[in-house]
């Protein structure tokens, strides 16, 4: 036996399965301002006490399933995560909210990738847990300040576009796949000249055989410049720079900048947080706005007892960097409860958000002037939803109508005109003190 092993044995070092509860469940722990706090919805397996399940969640901070001899080379008390509080979920059998505190030193500065790898990278497969959901995170000020955040933010975007006092209008070009680059550009032009502020590549428009990315970028740039000349307004098209490699993604963003367009787009979940943060840094350095699409989010956030809700993904996007993010509609075809949606909309836009469990916000969050993100309402909405959308999302938003623009029987430009007229009527009515909730349909009829 080596001297090191002999020493460990003499002080009680024993191999075997570790009892998580003894190490990671510390109900007397007082959280620090520098801790990252997490609220997990825990569903233990039958026979597993909630304290053990909560402690197992915290194990991802430093642990493994057994005691190892290298534990003696560091301070477990300094670095371990701690499950410091557990409470039952009202109205749900065998579900608990477990609160876990992680010391800040566990995380690399400015890395959403590392944060998620540490907190949720492994624990969701533990046998002791039937299901696990990360409900919310409290990001401490000390960690927030290590992130650049959105490339520009809400106010800078409005200044770039010279558009104030109303929501912005967008449209996703349809059909999303199958058009040639020239026909695609024609659809963009018709929408922009009709009064929209933005048009958009759909999330899976990258560089397919029928429409290579460079051709699409060129025809879309031609369309927006022509629409700008005709309308006197600044226009944009979300050119999707998402690609198979980070190098190719940046190459596409560079070409967009050379064309002089104002905004590019990234599928930040399928592309990954490392790629997204890299693109966000490029966009800030080169004056491009960044539209982030949440493709794949429902794989992660739709289940009520497993995965993580969109509020966590929204916080991560604000840290990683994006000037826009899709946020559901409340009234459209995609799932989204009003209060929960407004909860993460506030997390995207506001500088300081108070704890409010009724809206799914488990912790007070201080963003310390990190730029805000504009929420994008998109998915199954049309002109008759305009009063509700204007009331729900307010001015600092993008209201994005795909089929609600392109489906107009007279064509794309009349569809865009209808949306612009409806929006301006709703904003004027709101400013005059009219109730959009009760008078919305009447306001739209008057405008038509």
UniProtKB/Swiss-Prot annotation:
Coiled coil: none annotated. This is Ribulose bisphosphate carboxylase large chain. Residues 1-2 form a propeptide. It catalyses: 2 (2R)-3-phosphoglycerate + 2 H(+) = D-ribulose 1,5-bisphosphate + CO2 + H2O; D-ribulose 1,5-bisphosphate + O2 = 2-phosphoglycolate + (2R)-3-phosphoglycerate + 2 H(+). CDD domains: RuBisCO_large_I. Its cofactor is Mg(2+). The gene is rbcL. Keywords: Acetylation, Calvin cycle, Carbon dioxide fixation, Chloroplast, Disulfide bond, Lyase, Magnesium, Metal-binding, Methylation, Monooxygenase, Oxidoreductase, Photorespiration, Photosynthesis, Plastid. GO terms for molecular function: magnesium ion binding; monooxygenase activity; ribulose-bisphosphate carboxylase activity.
């Amino acid at each position: 036996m080596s001297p090191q092993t002999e020493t460990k044995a003499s002080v009680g070092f024993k191999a075997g399965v570790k009892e998580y509860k003894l190490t990671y469940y510390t109900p007397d722990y007082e959280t620090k301002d520098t801790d990252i706090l997490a609220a997990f919805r825990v569903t233990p397996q039958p026979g597993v006490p909630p304290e053990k399940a909560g402690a197992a969640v915290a194990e991802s901070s430093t642990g493994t399933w057994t005691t190892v001899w290298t534990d003696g080379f560091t301070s477990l008390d300094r670095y371990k995560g701690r499950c410091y509080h557990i409470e039952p979920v009202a109205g749900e059998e065998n579900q608990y909210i477990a609160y876990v505190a992680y010391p800040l030193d566990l995380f690399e500065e400015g890395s959403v990738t590392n944060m998620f790898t540490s907190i949720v990278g492994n624990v969701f497969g533990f046998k002791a847990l039937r299901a696990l959901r990360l409900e919310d995170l409290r990001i401490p000020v000390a960690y927030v300040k290590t992130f650049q955040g959105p490339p520009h933010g809400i106010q800078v975007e409005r200044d770039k576009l010279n558009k104030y006092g109303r929501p912005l209008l967008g449209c996703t070009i349809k059909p999303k796949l199958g058009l040639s680059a020239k026909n695609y550009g024609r659809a963009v032009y018709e929408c922009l000249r009709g009064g929209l502020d933005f048009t958009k590549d759909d999330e899976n428009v990258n560089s397919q055989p029928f429409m290579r990315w460079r051709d699409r970028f060129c025809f879309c740039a031609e369309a927006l410049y022509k629409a700008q000349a005709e309308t006197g307004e600044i226009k944009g098209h979300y050119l999707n720079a998402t690609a198979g490699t980070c190098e190719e993604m940046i190459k596409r963003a560079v070409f967009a900048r050379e064309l002089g367009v104002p905004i590019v787009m990234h599928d930040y979940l399928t592309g990954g947080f490392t790629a997204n943060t890299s693109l966000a840094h490029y966009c800030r350095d080169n004056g491009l706005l960044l539209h982030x699409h949440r493709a794949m989010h429902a794989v992660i956030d739709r289940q009520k007892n497993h995965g993580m809700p969109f509020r966590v993904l929204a916080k991560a996007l604000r840290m990683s960097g994006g000037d826009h993010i899709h946020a559901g509609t409340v009234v459209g075809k995609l799932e989204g409860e009003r209060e929960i949606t407004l909860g993460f909309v506030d997390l995207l836009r506001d500088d300081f958000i108070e704890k409010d469990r009724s809206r799914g916000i488990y912790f007070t969050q201080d963003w310390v002037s990190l730029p805000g993100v504009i929420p994008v309402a998109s998915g199954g909405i049309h002109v008759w939803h305009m009063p509700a959308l204007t009331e729900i999302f307010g001015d600092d938003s993008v209201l994005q109508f795909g089929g609600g623009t392109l489906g107009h029987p007279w064509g794309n430009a009349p569809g865009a005109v209808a949306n612009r007229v409806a929006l301006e009527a709703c904003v004027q009515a709101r400013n005059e003190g009219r109730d959009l909730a009760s008078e919305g349909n009447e306001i739209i009829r008057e405008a038509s």
